[in-house]
Regions:
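N-terminal auxiliary segments of SAM/dcSAM-dependent transferases
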Residues: 2-44
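Conserved alpha-helix/loop element of class I SAM-dependent methyltransferases that forms part
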Residues: 41-77, 81, 87-95
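Conserved SAM/SAH-binding beta-strand->alpha-helix loop
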Residues: 108
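Conserved SAM-binding loop
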Residues: 115-116
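A short acidic, Gly/Pro-enriched loop at the edge of an enzyme's catalytic core
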Residues: 144-153, 157-188
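A short glycine-rich, Lys/Arg-flanked "PGG" loop and its adjoining helix->strand segment in the class I
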Residues: 203-218
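Short, glycine-/aromatic-enriched active-site segment of Class I SAM-dependent methyltransferases
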Residues: 224-245
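C-terminal lobe and adjacent flexible extensions of AdoMet/dcAdoMet transferase-like proteins
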Residues: 261-312
Length: 312
């Protein structure tokens, strides 16, 4: 999932609201890649036949709140934002088949290591290799951080001049070797990750999704939403943030974020009645919404015009 240090454009991990959100997320999901954290996010059921080729280690260390893979078709090119252990990518690889392609993007080295660990073995079982994992931030799908890491190993930053050269290199690869090219993706999926992005980066996140989608492309997102805007004192809690709670969008703001990024035809495919967490003693029940309620939502949207919102 999300986390860590080098940021395109300035080379430093940023602090917002007095909280280093990226460091909190990196640490939590880095640990969760090593040892299962059972209560992180909401477990869901998947098609068991699609899990047969996937090692238990990947399945056990998957942290999501929905199943966007249900909205994928054969032959499509799919981008998974915050691909984590790679479980969704390996499920989707079987749906799109040998003619399709799946790209997982994540910022967390331990998660990427886990996802890549079984690539060859799973491909051998399927008889084709159509999955790859790339390191980057989901709010900046132009900067390939594996390339940045490689550059830094050969050209460590030891002066202001070196830093300027790093910035120049990052600008160059963003244009000549983007992590994800413009209009190259049929479908974007993401599972309980958008909420982990820092507040000031969320607008860029939605703009990047729109940029990389082909015209007529689709988005299927499972994430956490709240019925009211999360209060500042909760947003400043790194444990709640990294647990997919205090970074949640308010429900209407979540939908509006897609609209503001020029998406159309927003369909609420599923809105869970059960709550993910109880915060500060607030009770959660059925479809009742109360201050601080956090629920799971699956949203599908299109990059072409159609009616505003719809429930499936």
């Amino acid at each position: 999932m999300e986390g860590e240090s080098v940021v395109a454009g300035n080379g430093h991990n940023k602090v917002a609201n007095g909280v280093n959100y990226e460091a909190a997320v990196l640490e939590r999901y880095g640990d969760a890649a090593q040892e299962v954290e059972a209560c992180l996010c909401l477990p869901v059921s998947y098609d068991k036949t699609l899990l047969e080729v996937i090692p238990d280690e990947i399945i056990e260390k998957d942290y999501g709140c929905g199943d966007p893979s249900k909205y994928i078709h054969k032959g499509e090119t799919v981008l998974d934002l915050g691909s984590g252990s790679g479980k969704a990518c390996y499920i989707i690889s079987q749906i799109v088949g040998a003619q399709g392609k799946v790209i997982g993007v994540d910022f967390n080295p331990p998660m990427l290591e886990l996802a890549r660990k079984y690539q060859k073995a799973i491909g051998a079982k399927l008889g084709y290799y159509n999955v790859e994992f790339r390191r980057g931030k989901i709010q900046d799908l132009k900067t390939n951080l594996d390339l940045v890491d490689g550059y830094l190993k050969e050209h460590p930053v030891q002066s202001v001049a070196d830093l300027a050269k790093l910035d120049e290199y990052q600008t160059k690869i963003r244009h000549t070797l983007p992590l994800i090219a413009d209009a190259s993706i049929d479908v974007i999926v993401s599972n309980c990750v958008l909420n982990l992005v820092r507040p000031e980066d969320k607008k860029a996140l939605f703009a990047e999704m729109y940029r990389v989608l082909k015209r007529g492309g689709r988005v299927a997102i499972s994430d956490i939403v709240s019925d009211e805007v999360v209060p500042e004192h909760l947003a400043k809690d790194p444990n709640l943030w990294s647990a997919c709670v205090s970074g949640a969008f308010q429900e209407e703001e979540f939908l509006k974020a897609f609209e503001d990024a020029k998406f159309h035809g927003i369909t609420i495919e599923e809105l869970r009645s059960e709550a993910y967490q109880t915060v500060e003693g607030i009770e959660f029940r059925a479809v009742t919404v109360s201050p601080g309620t956090f629920t799971s939502a699956l949203i599908s949207v299109s990059a072409t015009p159609s009616p505003r919102y719809a429930f499936a």
